[in-house]
Amino acid sequence: MIEMARLRVYELARKLNMSPKELLQELEELGVNVKSHMSYVDEEMANIIIDLLEEDNRKAKQPSKPKKEKGEEEVEKEVVEKKKKKKITLKPDELKLDIIAEKIGVPQNKIIQDMFVKRGIALRPGQILKLEEVEQILKEYKIEIEIEEEQQTSVEEVDEFELLEKRYQELYEKEKDKLVPRPPVVTVMGHVDHGKTTLLDRIRSTRVAEREEGGITQSIGAYQVEVNGKKITFIDTPGHELFTEMRARGAQATDIVVLVVAADDGVMPQTIEAYNHAKAANVPIIVAINKIDKPNANVEKTKQELVEKLGLIPEEWGGDTIVVPISARTGQGVDELLEMILLVAEMNEIKCYPEGPARAVIIESKLDKKMGPVASVIVKDGVLKVGDAVVASNTYGRVRNLFDDNMRPIREAYPSQPVMILGFEDVPDVHSNVYVVESAEKAKEIVEKRLQRLEAQKQSRKHINLEELMKMMQEKEKKVLNLILKADTYGSVAALKNAINKLQSKEIELNIVHAGVGEISTSDVMLAAAVDGVILGFRVKVNNQARRLAEQEGVDVRTYSIIYKLVEDLKLALEGMLEPEEVEEVIGHGEIRKVFKISKVGKVAGVQMLDGKADRNGFVRIYRNGQLVFEGKIESLKHYKEDVNVVEAPQECGIKFAGFDDIQEGDELEFYVIRKVKRKPTFVEEQADQEQK
């Protein structure tokens, strides 16, 4: 019998040489009720669990007859499930977002938001899609796809980057038995001045093994530490902007987020924003309540704010959020935080494909005066070696040198290891994926084809601004304007939302994708780019990086200091989104006094204008005895022998009607034009006022 005091489930699992997940599954099968791996069990319960597991193991070792019936039932169930799945067939020229949206019955804007939030893929209305993007969309909505064979007729159109990424997806799906655990990659987030950088520095200074004398003089953007014989990789650039940009580019590197909240300050605006980004990415969150060494620290109050403002319930309060009180300054609680990171990694089964060509994600890139183009990466799969041919975004190269996080030269890098690569022809885009290919020649060919493809798609990459909304044509009756709102205070955000909601109408939906407090950042721009939205800022500035990115991505960013001006601009944009209303205007009347038959022309009416005018570019109705006999266009209009555009009363004129010769003397004519009149939406507030009247 194992002697032990009261302990948590994960600690018991460790003593039994099991993973917490395996133990939880065993306990569930045995009927033992525990909430999570953080639940406590007392000594008596622990010994009962051990006895039950030993008995279960003894039974498992006894030979048993195969349950054929169950297998058949499972096969039948699988067949039924497959039948239930919806399937669509696409032609090669139908790989466009608007066409796919129509085929699967999901609005474009809904697809754009779902793909950005859930899968980190940025799409635009009507965008020509890669096959892999189509598969991701259909996977999200559980729809099978079939592409007609003629797709393969043009090899030139295949995106090699898409095939490289698909290679790893297939490995993960078809060769699960070859996947092995890898060290977790952690991003630290939180409000400014809550201690993100101090925590990263504390972990680095106390845990990085074999630091060279004099310290590390250069950071490569990430580092690895060792805890109880296991490794953890930390991205050394805290903040959710980097995190969001990675997601937007489909190159997410983070496995776990540590959300830092100061015990003396509580949950603040950037805490909420960071949490929303982590939650949207479906990444496990561990909360580190920092600064517990301060006199005014209040851990319990901070936990209460986690519940009230974020919906994060600590495990000790019956929830499933791991909360660790720490002091990054003194080091108190940091070891426990690291242990919790390893525990969460184990529970989430973070794995990789350890063999074959490497795949990595770029976390930093720059042009170094001495070394040339360099890229700091975290290896995701395979082994990256010196001499490998690589491609990334818009460039390629051969790995000339590799440096680890201590800037020491190495020959190979393994999954989750941060390294610096030298050897790219140009500086690769930060946050993009790196792939190893068979040769430098192949790498060059892949990138050249991609650059040609990108150039061809350049025109489709421009986003809308408020003026261009006036020219927008959408495939649906109801139009949608996506908005990202940023303001100086939560009070201002509430006021903006209230004002904007009053502009809702039955013709146009105003969709607030995100609303927050603080300056307009790169993450706001990336989100706006993903949903083809407009950013509206109230009493906030646009940071320089965001301004540059907005120009690059073609995202419209507007800032205001007066709320009514923002509302007026928005009203104008909404009016511009509506197609003009066609209004008929009667401009004159006349009477046919004489009918002339002209060879090769037909019948021409001699008309006396009674009032108003006749317009050559307008329309006419012909009435006989009060009955409408013709409505259509004027083919020709003459005053005497001269072709004219307009004839006014009381003049006479000759008219040839388009496609109609059955005219008689005495027929009455009504002339009219169709004018396009700017249409105004019926806003919610105005509609309510009208109903009251």
UniProtKB/Swiss-Prot annotation:
GO terms for molecular function: GTP binding; GTPase activity; translation initiation factor activity. Its main location: cytoplasm. Residues 215-219 are annotated as: G2. It comes from Thermotoga petrophila (strain ATCC BAA-488 / DSM 13995 / JCM 10881 / RKU-1). GTP binds at residues 190-197, 236-240, 290-293. Signal peptide: none annotated. Residues 190-197 are annotated as: G1. It is found in: Cytoplasm. Coiled coil: none annotated. This is Translation initiation factor IF-2. NCBIfam families: IF-2 (TIGR00487), small_GTP (TIGR00231). One of the essential components for the initiation of protein synthesis. Protects formylmethionyl-tRNA from spontaneous hydrolysis and promotes its binding to the 30S ribosomal subunits. Also involved in the hydrolysis of GTP during the formation of the 70S ribosomal complex. Residues 327-329 are annotated as: G5. Residues 236-239 are annotated as: G3. It comes from the Bacteria. Residues 290-293 are annotated as: G4. Belongs to the TRAFAC class translation factor GTPase superfamily. Classic translation factor GTPase family. IF-2 subfamily. Residues 181-349 form the tr-type G domain. It holds the Pfam family IF-2. Keywords: Cytoplasm, GTP-binding, Initiation factor, Nucleotide-binding, Protein biosynthesis. One of its GO terms (cellular component) is cytosol. The keyword GTP-binding applies.
